[in-house]
Amino acid sequence: MLNTCYTLITGASEGFGRALAIECASRNMNLILVALPGPELHYLTHFIKRNYDVDVIAIEKDLCKDESCMELYTRVTELDLQVNMLINNAGIGSTVLFEEGTVSLYEKQIKLNVLATTLLTRLFLKTLQRNSHSYILNVGSMASFFYLPKKEVYGATKSYIYFFSKSLRKELSKSNVHVSVLCPGGMNTNLALTLMNKSGNYLSRLSVMNPEDVVPVAIDGLLNGKEVIIPGKMNNFFMLLDKILPNAIKKIITGQGMKKLSAVNPFTRYLSPAPVLIK
């Protein structure tokens, strides 16, 4: 194990974060895995150590809590770990009518999706700048490009991630730090989301991907310096449609989508109003 640098991944214990961790380990990257306290993080750590010749540091941290980002940065600094890749993956999603969502849900969603990503990027930036090449991958969403009922706050937080990443990339364009934003569509990251995704219409089902299929595209795009990474042919097709369709037609489509969302979906009880960790 000659590599002495580390890739830090937040929301790493399950779903997309777990897939990211395994993909990075398969590329001989040492890992700092950050996730909520629980057995999943330790299971993943042991799995990677058994199967890959990389070093793995597991840090339990609830990034919704005040001072948690500073505590994480301090812990990494105390361990004298050199981070050359930061993947801000942790986030909270939800599918709920805005008026039915709790204040606590929206507060946590904004803290984790927006504030934690911003603060961790700021805290680790000087560390990243010490390397010959460093990378920041912020996990956004296709939701940042569309007006989605029941996902108003989630979509808004991902719009922030999109514009924050693009602006920071421009600011750091002459430095050694490369910034990319990943904008996936729906992903089958847990059982409830898998069931709900299968209950969608034909086009929405075509756009859904498994985390294991997204992560190679994400890491390849990051290492190749791609600014915006949109995995999947169908998702790229949707982006093309969004550019060429008149607003009037998009409003009609959104209205039809609202009617479908207003119908009772047997799987939304697993998703709302409680938050779903997007990892």
Task: Identify the residue ranges that each predicted region occupies.
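Active-site helix of classical SDR
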Residues: 121, 157
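Substrate-binding pocket helix/loop in short-chain dehydrogenase/reductase
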Residues: 97-110
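Conserved NAD(P)H cofactor-binding loop of Rossmann-fold oxidoreductase domains
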Residues: 89-94
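Residue(s) in the substrate-gating loop at a strand-loop-helix junction
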Residues: 141
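Conserved glycine-rich Rossmann-like NAD(P)H-binding loop of the short-chain dehydrogenase/reductase
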Residues: 27-44
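Conserved glycine-rich cofactor-binding loop
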Residues: 11-14
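C-terminal helical subdomain
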Residues: 181, 202-239
